[in-house]
């Protein structure tokens, strides 16, 4: 189960420098968007992911892929290949902020995601102003939607 909230922060308003934190290079594409079936390269790891419908709460299953399988599936994606840098910033309460800085045609889009252990925690989270607009309930900011723009 994936329980997350999404925000649109302004990079100039962040109280930290993303470059001070670990960064992963992510490339992903969608074989299907309803339901979501995604392939992803995360640094040197490769995955096939299924995600159910939903906004804040969705079922998610990740299966490892070989690089060869990933490269075989990559030409079969619908829409654009998404490329982004992901910075992981620790937050209070054992939470982590995943800051995605999109590249190429989706630049300068920045999306911040925070995963929660349960819905109650997600709903109770008081977002600091620097996180910007809460777009959790907007399907427009799902990567599967962005792949079609």
Model-predicted segments: where are they?
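Phosphate-end processing signature that detects enzymes handling 5′-triphosphorylated RNA
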Residues: 1-149
């Amino acid at each position: 189960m994936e329980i997350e909230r999404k925000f649109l922060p302004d990079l100039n308003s962040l109280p930290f420098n993303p470059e001070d934190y670990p960064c992963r290079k992510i490339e992903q594409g969608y074989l299907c968007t309803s339901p979501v079936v995604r392939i992803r390269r995360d640094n040197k790891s490769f995955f096939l992911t299924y995600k159910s419908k939903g906004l804040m709460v969705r079922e998610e299953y990740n299966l490892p892929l070989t690089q060869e399988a990933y490269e075989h599936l990559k030409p079969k994606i619908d829409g654009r290949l998404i490329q982004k840098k992901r910075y992981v910033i620790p937050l209070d309460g054992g939470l982590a902020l995943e800051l995605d800085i999109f590249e190429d045609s989706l630049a300068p889009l920045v999306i911040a995601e925070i995963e929660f252990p349960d819905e109650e925690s997600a709903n109770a989270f008081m977002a600091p102003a620097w996180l910007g607009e809460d777009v959790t309930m907007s399907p427009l900011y799902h990567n599967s939607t962005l792949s079609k723009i």
